[in-house]
Amino acid sequence: MNPISLLFLALAMSTDAFAAALGKGASLHKPRFLEALRTGLIFGAIETITPVIGWGIGQVAARFAESWDHWIAFTLLLVLGLHMIYNGIKHDDDEEQEKPGQHSFWILAVTAFATSIDALAVGVGLAFVDVNIVVAALAIGLATTVMVTIGVMLGRVLGTMVGKRAEIIGGIVLIVVGATILYEHLSAAQ
């Protein structure tokens, strides 16, 4: 996977967490930078671990599917991208119902894990392409940390305007990354 695709993948993986962070920030009276950074670090750590776990699962499966691995990666990213777009379109006000006191470590960790399920599946897909999983996981984790920190700070102002649109954009980016992987493999085979 080339560096540009990796960058787009990392940003795409962070958009659902960014959308959740907007909601978290919107529910705080005055988000402080340390609270935003703490939230970003929790989300980023979980988003770093989940693709590695998925990659490990994918490594076991990769031995059985080497001839069609690029189709697996494309299909996973396509399905995840479409799922993110669907979630961005459907009406869901759960984030707005949370109260400011619910920003405990465990609430943030559970929210972070819920938004990182797609990173777990992407990790499975990454097992089928030529990528350094440590670099990919760190890129995803760093992008998530930065995006969530910014999301919490922007949440109070932009939470209701941008929240779900970020997830739609992330879904589109995932589909483009998947199509790029498929194109690279098919053009290399010619």
Curated annotation (Swiss-Prot):
<dbReference type="GO" id="GO:0005886">
    <property type="term" value="C:plasma membrane"/>
</dbReference>
<comment type="function">
    <text>Probably functions as a manganese efflux pump.</text>
</comment>
<feature type="transmembrane region" description="Helical">
    <location>
        <begin position="105"/>
        <end position="125"/>
    </location>
</feature>
<feature type="transmembrane region" description="Helical">
    <location>
        <begin position="168"/>
        <end position="188"/>
    </location>
</feature>
<keyword id="KW-1003">Cell membrane</keyword>
<keyword id="KW-1133">Transmembrane helix</keyword>
<comment type="similarity">
    <text>Belongs to the MntP (TC 9.B.29) family.</text>
</comment>
<feature type="transmembrane region" description="Helical">
    <location>
        <begin position="133"/>
        <end position="153"/>
    </location>
</feature>
<keyword id="KW-0997">Cell inner membrane</keyword>
<dbReference type="InterPro" id="IPR022929">
    <property type="entry name" value="Put_MntP"/>
</dbReference>
<dbReference type="InterPro" id="IPR003810">
    <property type="entry name" value="Mntp/YtaF"/>
</dbReference>
<keyword id="KW-0464">Manganese</keyword>
<keyword id="KW-0472">Membrane</keyword>
<dbReference type="GO" id="GO:0005384">
    <property type="term" value="F:manganese ion transmembrane transporter activity"/>
</dbReference>
<feature type="transmembrane region" description="Helical">
    <location>
        <begin position="69"/>
        <end position="89"/>
    </location>
</feature>
<protein>
    <recommendedName>
        <fullName>Putative manganese efflux pump MntP</fullName>
    </recommendedName>
</protein>
<feature type="transmembrane region" description="Helical">
    <location>
        <begin position="3"/>
        <end position="23"/>
    </location>
</feature>
<dbReference type="Pfam" id="PF02659">
    <property type="entry name" value="Mntp"/>
</dbReference>
<keyword id="KW-0813">Transport</keyword>
<keyword id="KW-0812">Transmembrane</keyword>
<keyword id="KW-0406">Ion transport</keyword>
<feature type="transmembrane region" description="Helical">
    <location>
        <begin position="41"/>
        <end position="61"/>
    </location>
</feature>
